[in-house]
């Protein structure tokens, strides 16, 4: 049994293929998937998937590199986060790389709106005690700092969350673990150039790991460059299994157990 802890099944590349994807998931023993919300406008579609299929769940949140869209208030996030089948807040966080690239080298000082948005997501998560799905790219220092400033190590620590599609150093991983977070590995782990990330994964405690596809992006080897989907998450488990001296099936069961522990609202949804 495998669980894809992060996918975007509402995106156009995947939603039209959903019946085929579900068949492929079944054949690959991928029994569950968490469908990630990236804008408030997208939420209804993501939530519809979770309400329609009993092995899908949803989040609510706004991705940090979506600038010119409706900005949710804490109350917006709280109201949607309390709906059935919504088990996390996110994805949220900071992405200085994407915004700098798109905006012609904009400085970090120009991205205060990202930090304000992140704080609102943290406050919503704290209010309703939902875990968060964290996106951080070229911004780990600020991500960790804001989590600490917002009391993540205190009253939100019990809810925690996950640093998804992890690509950072072991030091960042340890800091995230110390705050009560889990770490999720994607198809990047299979890339030839990702030896440093595999070293982090080899070090990672077994009880704090998740696996994901981040589909339709980041298809693992041997499908790199193609459209990703949740049925490919066992390829991530295979690499983790090699690093840990386990079988892929054991990694699948272990990470599914971790998923259940991190997202307790699963049991009530």
What name fits each language-model region?
Residues 1-269:
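Mid-domain alpha/beta scaffold segments of enzyme catalytic cores
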